[in-house]
């Protein structure tokens, strides 16, 4: 248990991975049964089968499912916009990832770029089923896929979800010269040009 009363991820999962994201064909392994990637990964049947993936969560409105019979598909029809209600899907997607894992399968969660929507859903899953706080879940996913950057609206929904699960939040929204961002972005935002999706 951490000092916040949450368990931490198992030590075997906490060790840095020596496999680069490029070696995984554009996907990152988040846990033994959860992968995160961009949309093009979902079209690579050989890669999916090689990783033991049995379920594909498609968190886009713009990419159709391939509907190959050997995979189960879950569609989360959302745009990568701050007002999109991704929080409505946190429990459903987390429960599905957990169910697939218990059946010894693996899940790929993808969006178009593997940066915002899919990362948000993976973070929510870690909070719910690995009992880690939002900050730990974000740092864990970012260590596995450094390009992740959930949009501000998704952060607000993750903060609300953490409060619902644990009664407090470990990430706060703060004012910066570029607008309101989660405090985990504050340091890096000092070096960024303005970007609408911060």
Swiss-Prot record:
SMART domains membership: DSPc
Database matches in CDD domains: DUSP14 (cd14572)
Domain Tyrosine-protein phosphatase: 26-167
Substrates-to-products reaction catalysed: O-phospho-L-tyrosyl-[protein] + H2O = L-tyrosyl-[protein] + phosphate; O-phospho-L-seryl-[protein] + H2O = L-seryl-[protein] + phosphate; O-phospho-L-threonyl-[protein] + H2O = L-threonyl-[protein] + phosphate
Active site location: 111 (phosphocysteine intermediate)
UniProt keyword annotations, A-Z: Hydrolase, Protein phosphatase
MF terms (GO), sorted A to Z: MAP kinase tyrosine/serine/threonine phosphatase activity; protein serine/threonine phosphatase activity; protein tyrosine phosphatase activity
Keyword Hydrolase: yes
Classification via PROSITE patterns: TYR_PHOSPHATASE_1, TYR_PHOSPHATASE_2, TYR_PHOSPHATASE_DUAL
Keyword Methyltransferase annotated: no
EC number: 3.1.3.16, 3.1.3.48
Signal peptide span: none
Subunit record text: Interacts with CD28.
Annotated function: Involved in the inactivation of MAP kinases. Dephosphorylates ERK, JNK and p38 MAP-kinases. Plays a negative role in TCR signaling by dephosphorylating MAP3K7 adapter TAB1 leading to its inactivation.
Family that this chain belongs to: Belongs to the protein-tyrosine phosphatase family. Non-receptor class dual specificity subfamily.
Name recorded for this polypeptide: Dual specificity protein phosphatase 14
């Amino acid at each position: 248990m951490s000092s916040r009363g949450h368990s931490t991820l198992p030590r075997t999962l906490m060790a840095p991975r020596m496999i680069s994201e490029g070696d995984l064909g554009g996907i990152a392994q988040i846990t033994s049964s959860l992968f995160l990637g961009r949309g093009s990964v979902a079209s690579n049947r050989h890669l999916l089968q090689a990783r033991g993936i049995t379920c594909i969560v498609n968190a886009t409105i713009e990419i159709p499912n391939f509907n190959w019979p050997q995979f189960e598909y879950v569609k989360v029809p959302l745009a990568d916009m701050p007002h999109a209600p991704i929080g409505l899907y946190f429990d459903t997607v987390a429960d599905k990832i957990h169910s697939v894992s218990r059946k010894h399968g693996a899940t790929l969660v993808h969006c178009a770029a593997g940066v915002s929507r899919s990362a948000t859903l993976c973070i929510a899953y870690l909070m719910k089923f690995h009992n880690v706080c939002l900050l730990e879940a974000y740092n864990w996913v970012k260590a596995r896929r450094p390009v992740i950057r959930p949009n501000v609206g998704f952060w607000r929904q993750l903060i609300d979800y953490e409060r619902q699960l644990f009664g407090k939040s470990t990430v706060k929204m703060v004012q910066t010269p570029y607008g309101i961002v989660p405090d985990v972005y504050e340091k890096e935002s000092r070096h960024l040009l303005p970007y609408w999706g911060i």
